[in-house]
């Protein structure tokens, strides 16, 4: 596609979610890449200016670099569709489903995709029954947050209440999830094609917000070092997990590989990070796709699915 055919592009960044800081980093990295490629691209932060200004300012399409609520949950996608403005990533329904880990897990279970067992929690939950079912340790997290915000690993039953309260500060839907010990992996999908798997090794604790975006000790291996047969099997399952939610364009599917070689899928991200610590650019690089090329490919897909 000719660069001129992309028209005037708004890079949506920042936003109102708890992931605003990361979205600003992703958005500015995307903006710089587009401008290096001679795309007429401009930053647009929905905080402080209404989305309808996109039409008033003559934008032709949007690159969504928003993360979390109001940007990755179908809200912005719906507004852009009402304005008939093409955008990157998945549509309204797939975005909303992927943002909701509870409904994602229900769909994956119905489709035969392995995901850790779970229990939905509320203020009246019997935590003893939860630990009897899921065992310890377990994970407690908000159903509709990203970047592991509000997530805690619970090693002892007496810590269940405080972990629940932390998660409930971020969302009315809270999940207690079976903890799977194993290798943390992520599978990036670009234009319905799985990219090389990324293996994540955290030296201490969980792969949480700090480890994802700020730690210099988190180790990433791409390609993952797994056998070709196992890699292909995981990539195929990740692509199926992406498709069954209705995702289009690009996404990132996170999983744990247990000691028996069984992948357990955790979540799908329809607007993955694009910072210097981010995993999709890392996977693309291993596939021979530079960051600038990746950004252009994602943007071009907004034309295909428009």
Curated annotation (Swiss-Prot):
Its main location: cytoplasm. It holds the Pfam family Dala_Dala_lig_N. ATP binds at residues 131-186. Mg(2+) 2 binds at residues 267, 269. Its cofactor is Mg(2+); Mn(2+). Residues 105-300 form the ATP-grasp domain. InterPro entries: ATP-grasp, ATP_grasp_subdomain_1, D-Ala_lig_Van_CS, D_ala_D_ala, Dala_Dala_lig_C, Dala_Dala_lig_N, PreATP-grasp_dom_sf. One of its GO terms (cellular component) is cytosol. GO terms for biological process: cell wall organization; peptidoglycan biosynthetic process; regulation of cell shape. Pathway: Cell wall biogenesis; peptidoglycan biosynthesis. Belongs to the D-alanine--D-alanine ligase family. This is D-alanine--D-alanine ligase. It comes from Nitrosomonas eutropha (strain DSM 101675 / C91 / Nm57). The gene is ddl.
């Amino acid at each position: 596609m000719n660069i001129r055919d992309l028209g005037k592009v708004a890079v949506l960044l920042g936003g109102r979610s708890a992931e605003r800081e990361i979205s600003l980093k992703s958005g500015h990295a995307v903006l710089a890449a587009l401008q290096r490629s001679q795309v007429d691209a401009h930053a647009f932060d929905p905080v402080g200016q209404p989305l309808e200004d996109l039409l008033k300012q003559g934008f032709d399409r949007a690159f969504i670099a928003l993360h979390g609520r109001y940007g990755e949950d179908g809200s912005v996608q719906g507004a852009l569709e009402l304005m008939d403005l093409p955008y990157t990533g998945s549509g309204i329904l797939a975005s909303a489903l992927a943002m909701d880990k509870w409904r994602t897990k229900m769909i994956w279970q119905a489709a035969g995709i392995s995901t850790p067992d779970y229990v939905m929690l509320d203020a009246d939950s019997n935590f003893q029954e939860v630990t009897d079912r899921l065992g310890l340790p377990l994970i407690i997290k908000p159903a509709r947050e990203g970047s592991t915000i509000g997530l805690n690993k619970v090693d002892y039953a007496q810590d269940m209440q405080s972990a629940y309260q932390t998660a409930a500060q971020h969302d009315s839907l809270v999940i207690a999830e079976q903890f799977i010990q194993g290798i943390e992996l992520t599978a990036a999908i670009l234009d319905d094609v799985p990219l090389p798997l990324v293996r994540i090794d955290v030296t201490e604790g969980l792969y949480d917000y700090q480890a994802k975006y700020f730690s210099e000790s988190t180790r990433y291996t791409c390609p993952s070092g797994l056998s070709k047969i196992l890699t292909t099997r995981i990539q195929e399952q990740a692509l199926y997990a992406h498709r069954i939610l209705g995702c289009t364009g690009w996404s990132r599917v996170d999983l744990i590989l247990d000691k028996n070689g069984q992948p357990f899928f955790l979540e799908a991200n329809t607007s993955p990070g694009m910072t210097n610590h981010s995993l999709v650019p890392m996977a693309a690089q291993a596939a021979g796709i530079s960051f600038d090329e990746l950004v252009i490919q994602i943007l071009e897909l907004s034309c295909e699915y428009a």
